[in-house]
Structures are given as structure tokens and as C-alpha cells.
Amino acid sequence: MWHEARKHERKLRGMMVDYKKRAERRREYYEKIKKDPAQFLQVHGRACKVHLDSAVALAAESPVNMMPWQGDTNNMIDRFDVRAHLDHIPDYTPPLLTTISPEQESDERKCNYERYRGLVQNDFAGISEEQCLYQIYIDELYGGLQRPSEDEKKKLAEKKASIGYTYEDSTVAEVEKAAEKPEEEESAAEEESNSDEDEVIPDIDVEVDVDELNQEQVADLNKQATTYGMADGDFVRMLRKDKEEAEAIKHAKALEEEKAMYSGRRSRRQRREFREKRLRGRKISPPSYARRDSPTYDPYKRSPSESSSESRSRSRSPTPGREEKITFITSFGGSDEEAAAAAAAAAASGVTTGKPPAPPQPGGPAPGRNASARRRSSSSSSSSSASRTSSSRSSSRSSSRSRRGGGYYRSGRHARSRSRSWSRSRSRSRRYSRSRSRGRRHSGGGSRDGHRYSRSPARRGGYGPRRRSRSRSHSGDRYRRGGRGLRHHSSSRSRSSWSLSPSRSRSLTRSRSHSPSPSQSRSRSRSRSQSPSPSPAREKLTRPAASPAVGEKLKKTEPAAGKETGAAKPKLTPQEKLKLRMQKALNRQFKADKKAAQEKMIQQEHERQEREDELRAMARKIRMKERERREKEREEWERQYSRQSRSPSPRYSREYSSSRRRSRSRSRSPHYRH
């Protein structure tokens, strides 16, 4: 089998190779015999009798009916022929006034070029009419001279070292002499340039090469063409145009042949190389989208206070009558540098309506109320400090409308705030006492009641809207009321929030308040261990605290909290916040993907079990049907065998005979085959 397959494959390959070679030979043959389409039309005529009947033919050719044309007895025409009226051809006299348009004149000149091109070339080459007619006669008899193709010319050009030698007279052939002649002599004698093979009867189909003509020959050609109705300079211009068109056609044909050569599935690389070669010299302009310039934006200019806090604020309800400047809280009564920075920011904002800002106190820590007087009431994102035992991070978004009178916060100050804050809290202090307090806080000025659930044994001051918070605190028994030790590090968007927090809290809170409330409020909390601690008065509705793992992750990004220094600790940058958020989202997504993968595996296993059960059931059904079919065939065969038997014994019942048939081997039963 293998040898036969190899033999068949060789036969097929030979047929394919033969077919390719035959196709190449056929293409070469057709290329060789291809001619100008103008040469396909040949008109041949001979003298013959129009009438088959001799009497009618004699009557038709009698002098009564026939007459010589233009007095030539050799050329007889019928007297009813229209040429009888052409005995006298008058000379053409052009009209004095030309009524043709310039377009018609241009078309007429082009037509004259097409009509008399051969005659102009013959006149320029000095070929008489008899020579031209004789050349036409030779072409009709033997066909046109086969001109060497471009490939043959290239092959001949490569063999320049070989010398044509004839053994008869032992002289160098005339080809070398013709090659050594200068170009000026070749251009002067047009007959030699037209046809080197036949000098007596030149080939009139060869057109004049315009590029080889000098100025005198060009002028002579144009002068010869003016006698045939062409303007001065038309003939050479149209000759050059024809040559360019022929070159373009030749180039297009070469491209088509090269494309046909590279056609097929396996010649993708050749096609790419051919395309690159064609586009090599061409300058390609860049695409439109690459040329367009991107819009440029000016860098976002931040104020020093804004860049220090790295937060933005948005005021939805500005105070009517004046535009509020955005300032940021930088201190809660800490060191001199922070107080000076706060005073400078307040003086630059120019928002105050009451007293001027309090001068910075050169002393140590100041009470919380005096320190809070240095803050500006604004719609801002506040950045503050935290104590050595506490640092909290909250992100609160508020839109508040406040009124400030004097340098202090008063209980009569109304803040209309709408805040949504998210923070996560965990508190830790020196005394690790865990307590749970449940306090009720009433909001002043018609605000809603709020329940606050806290595990912090604290008495928090301040009236605010409804607040619910859960926090764990290991509260200490010693807190500082204000000054350098108590800092609250937060990033909030609340206009009326001042805080003295002793606890390290990350509470997830969210609150919304539409009622005016005093910024300072008090709340009583029932707790297991009483230890007073001032707390921030913010409008919050807390969510359950985050897990300790999240708190540890957040703690890692902050600097060490064990240093007892009064300087403000840097808060989380937006990139770190985004990184934490992305990490949490990735963890959630990983858990969800893992759960989905497990469910998918369980589902696939369940489907596989169902398919196996279905296949078992189908196999069982097929076996049952096969068994029934065999039983039917066996019964049919027993019935036929019992009819064919000569002496059927009545004592053999069907059961007995069937049991005997079953015991027989399959080789003894020719009719029963499985």
C-alpha cells in the first residue's frame, strides 16, 4: 500500500510539474506572437464577377453600363456609381473667417496628429510613398519583423566582451562597427536609427524617439507637421505624451506580472517585499491623528495651605452677599509655628466678619476654646494633629452654612451642615479598660434625636444631629485638655468641626443633617467606668467598625505613633488611600472568584454525574432491546426449524426445544448469526 501511494504521489507530482511547465511554455508562446491590435485587421480583395449568369454579366460590363473613372480605362465603374460625380475634385480653400471654437481646434489638431503621424515621420525620414507601400506589402506577406524583447536585449548587452567573428572573410562583424559609431551620427541619419537591420526598406512602424532628437531635428519635425494641419510644436509634444503613456502601460504590465508571480498562499513574504520595494522611494505623510497636537493644560495651582492638607472642599450653599475664600485648619492650639501659619492663612483669606484673628501666643499649650478661635469657619477639608495616644482618620463630606461672630465659638452659633463621612475607628489608650456605654444625645434647634452606642467611657460635649457610633476604646485616665498633646489628624469636609480626641479611632460614619445645631454640644453616656474625655462634635451616623485586620493595614501606612512629639503626623496620601481601596476590592474580588470557581466545579461535577447516569440508562435500554431482538430471532428460527423437521415429536414442548436450541453452538445454526 505504501509503495502504491508513493507511486501515485510521484505520478501526481509529475503531472503538476508538467502542467506548470506547459503553462509557462504556453504563456511564452502567446507573449511571443502577441502583436499590435492594429495589425489584426487585414483587407484582401480580388476581381470577381458580381453576376453568375454570363449574359447578365456581359450586359452589366458593357460600355452602356460601365464607364471609366476619371478617364482611366483600367478602372471602370458603373454609371450609377456615386464615384461618377467625383470626376473633378476641387482644391480646398479654407474660409477667411474661422468659426470653430478653441476646443474644436484642439480636437482637430489631435485628430490630424492621429491621421498623419506616419506621413510626418516618413517625410522626416525621407521615405518615399513607394517604399512605404512596398514595406506594407512585405508585412502583409511575411508579417512584421520580430523585434528582440527586453530580456534578449539585456542578455546581448551583458555579452559585451564577445566579438562577432565571421569565418568566411576573417573580419569582425559589422555589429561592432555600428556599436562604435558616435551617437551624433546615429541621430542625424533617421533611417539608420529607425531600422538597423534593413537600410533599404526601413520599418515605418518604428516611431521617432523624441529623447534622442536634438533641437534642429525637433524643429524640423514640427515644421513637417504644420503642413498636415498641426500647430507648431504639437507633433513633438504629442509624441512625447504617447511615449510617456506607453511607459506607464509597460510599468503597469510589469507590476501585474510581478503580482501574478507572487500570487498564492505561500508567497506572502514576497508580496510584502514587493510592496516595500514599491513604497521605498515614496515619502509617506503621517496619519491625521499623529499630526494633531494634544491640548495643553496649565498646571493646577494650589495654595500652600491646600497643598499641606491635600484635600478639596466644595461649598453647596455659599453665604449670600460675599464669596467665601477656602482656608484650611492647620492647628488646634499647638506650637507657635502652627499657630502662626493658621493666623497667616486667616489674615490672607479675609473672610472674618467679627474680630480680627487672635495673635499667636508665644507660650506653651493653650486651652481648647482659645485654640479653636484661631480656626476659620469654612467649607474645607481639615487636616489636624493627633496626640501620642490617639490618631483618627475620617473622610467627611459636608456642605455647611455657618455664621461666625467674634473670635470664639459660641453656643448660639448655628451650623447648617449636610455631611457624609466615612471613617474607621479603633481606639487604644494607656488604661486598657473595655466598657460599653449607651448615651442619648439631643440636638438643639429642632434637630432629630440620635442614639449613640459607644464602648468608650467618655463624656462627649456638643449638640449635634443624629449620631450613631460604635467604637472600642481602651481609655486612659489622663488626658490633656488642649494644647500640644491633643491633636486630631483627620481629613474631613466639615465646616464646623473642632475636635479634641484622646482615642485612636477609625470609625466608619455617615450622617446627614438639615437642622441648625450648636457646634458645641454635650452628651451624657452611661458607662461602666467613668472617665471624662472631650470628643469631636460632628454630625455622624456611624457604621459598624471595620475588622482589626483592616485597622492594622491602615496603621502600617502611618508613621510610628509611639513618639511623643508635638509635631503633626503626616496623613495618608490619596495614592495610599487608593492603594488600600484597591487592595480591599481585590481581596473581595478574589474571594468572590474563588467561591464562583468552587460553585462552578461543583456544578460541573453534578452535570458529569448526570451525564454518566444518562449514559448508563441508555446503555441499559440498548442492551434490553438487543436481548429482545435476539429472543425474537431465536423464536422465529425455532418456528421455521420445527416446520422443516420431518418427524416433529409431540412430546417436545416449546420450552424443551428452546432450551435445546440454546445449548447448541452457534456454528451449528447457519440461519442464526449474531
Curated annotation (Swiss-Prot):
Positions of the UniProt region annotated as Disordered: 171-232, 258-674
Coiled coil, from the record: 585-647
UniProt family annotation: Belongs to the splicing factor SR family.
Compositionally skewed regions (Low complexity) per UniProt: 378-399, 493-506, 514-532, 642-651
Post-translational modification: Phosphorylated in vitro by CLK4.
Organism: Homo sapiens
Record field: compositional bias (Basic and acidic residues): 290-313, 590-617, 625-641
Ranges of compositional bias, category Pro residues: 356-365
Single GO BP term: RNA splicing
A Pfam family assignment: DRY_EERY
PANTHER family xref list: CLK4-ASSOCIATING SERINE_ARGININE RICH PROTEIN (PTHR13161:SF4), SPLICING FACTOR SUPPRESSOR OF WHITE APRICOT (PTHR13161)
Keywords tagged on the record: Coiled coil, mRNA processing, mRNA splicing, Nucleus, Phosphoprotein
Official protein name in the record: CLK4-associating serine/arginine rich protein
Annotated compartments: Nucleus
Biased composition annotated in UniProt, kind: Basic residues: 265-283, 411-443, 481-492, 659-674
Compositionally biased region (Acidic residues): 182-214
Function: Probably functions as an alternative splicing regulator. May regulate the mRNA splicing of genes such as CLK1. May act by regulating members of the CLK kinase family.
Modified residues (Phosphoserine): S101, S285, S294, S331, S335, S547
Subunit structure: Probably interacts with CLK4.
Gene Ontology CC: nucleoplasm
Residues annotated with Phosphothreonine modification: T327, T573
